[in-house]
Amino acid sequence: MSRMAEQQLYIHGGYTSATSGRTFETINPANGNVLATVQAAGREDVDRAVKSAQQGQKIWASMTAMERSRILRRAVDILRERNDELAKLETLDTGKAYSETSTVDIVTGADVLEYYAGLIPALEGSQIPLRETSFVYTRREPLGVVAGIGAWNYPIQIALWKSAPALAAGNAMIFKPSEVTPLTALKLAEIYSEAGLPDGVFNVLPGVGAETGQYLTEHPGIAKVSFTGGVASGKKVMANSAASSLKEVTMELGGKSPLIVFDDADLDLAADIAMMANFFSSGQVCTNGTRVFVPAKCKAAFEQKILARVERIRAGDVFDPQTNFGPLVSFPHRDNVLRYIAKGKEEGARVLCGGDVLKGDGFDNGAWVAPTVFTDCSDDMTIVREEIFGPVMSILTYESEDEVIRRANDTDYGLAAGIVTADLNRAHRVIHQLEAGICWINTWGESPAEMPVGGYKHSGIGRENGVMTLQSYTQVKSIQVEMAKFQSIF
């Protein structure tokens, strides 16, 4: 693909040049080619976007629930019509296999938008009787202008997960995509405008997180920030949001999730789940189950089943329908993952497979890392303690249920957890003791629109998806009505 035209900001229904004068490049990680130069939003651009959003939000909030619902449904239709086009762009920008982006990224994002479009007319208040002459009623009102800050692993899906409930509740959103993968969020802005969204209700500001993101979190005109990213960055976003104007926040942060295989489990099922929990999207999924606990007596058999499945991984041309494994998203991220792999070797973990870059025709110029499985791991190893965010599985053994629950919870993270067992009683007993916000039994990874997702501990605050997320983009106004004569003591 030839280099794209320079990408601008999207403010008030159209493209506009950044006032900062700064740009950055976005790279195709499969081959290292530059996809596009992208303009970076500065402080003045954030001010412009907020002013635009304030104007648009008033128009949007004044529309009826059914009018807003119809517009968002039109956006859903356009997303589905352009699924393949958007998936190709997402593959170029992220490196993910087209077999994945064409069936997951836009599809699941559109599903979430459709879900919230349907919920808009059901967003209602309550009535509370006090006595015969007085009652209270409540209204759920939009917050105003909110900000979404996305991560680089699911660019358009995250933009939809954040914008869908925000817009459904009557807010305007300013979205800052990751500077690593900024392209599809700009396309989403075009689609919203085409669907009839008033100008300013969805503005997109590409830029460097440390600058553009900080300007958004500090801006007094922003009522809420929804952030997806790493724990350290999330803490900065939360601190800036609180210090500036006590903004509400939703944080979807990192994870080091446990996958527990019990001795009664079907090991073929367990191996299939472990593969999806570690190598889907080349391991760049925040909920990945990278700490795989297996009974000591099952370890050898489980390892053989994993090795057999690693042979089924197909890396290569990301547009080949048979490819199911792409490069990492960037060269700096590849180098970071390789440092973790080197650390695992240094600390005594045994490499079962992988452990290096992928080499050969088609791989040398890209950010490729081989699917890697470590075994003979211990809880104190760096690869077991820290989030790697790459195709690296760690296999650990255990002896008892109580032991594995304790060890699974021995982490600062609490995003996800899962178990594989044939015993339904054990499944619920163990899941209820695991300290994680998203849990799976005999499956892994699905996050449907109806399911609230978010983390415990350092893995986040608040939830995305589900009814409660729509409510989190509103504020409740309570009104007391008195029909009798008011009595004053003065």
Swiss-Prot record:
Active-site residue list: K162, E252, C286, E464
Q: At which positions is NAD(+) bound? A: G150, A151, W152, K176, P177, S178, E179, G230, V231, A232, S233, G254, C286, E387
Summarize the pH-dependence annotation from the UniProt entry.
Optimum pH is between 7.5 and 9.5.
Summarize the activity regulation. Aldehydes with apolar groups are the most effective inhibitors. N-Methylated compounds are also inhibitory, but to a much lesser degree than the aldehydes. The alcohols are more inhibitory than the corresponding acids, and the inhibitory effect increases with the degree of methylation from ethanolamine to choline.
Q: Name one GO molecular function term.
A: identical protein binding
**Which residues are recorded as binding K(+) 2?**
L246, K457, G460
Q: Offer one example of a GO biological process linked to this entry.
A: response to X-ray
One Pfam family here:
Aldedh
Q: Does the keyword Nucleus apply?
A: no
Name its co-factor(s). Answer: K(+)
**What turns on expression?**
By osmotic stress. Choline is required for full expression. Oxygen and choline exert their control via the transacting DNA-binding proteins ArcA and BetI, respectively.
Does this entry carry the keyword Repeat? no
Q: Which residues carry this modification: Cysteine sulfenic acid (-SOH)?
A: C286
According to its UniProt entry, the function of this protein is described as: Involved in the biosynthesis of the osmoprotectant glycine betaine. Catalyzes the irreversible oxidation of betaine aldehyde to the corresponding acid. It is highly specific for betaine and has a significantly higher affinity for NAD than for NADP.
Put simply, this protein is called Betaine aldehyde dehydrogenase
Q: What does the organism's lineage look like at the top?
A: Bacteria, Pseudomonadati, Pseudomonadota, Gammaproteobacteria, Enterobacterales
- Tell me the gene name: betB
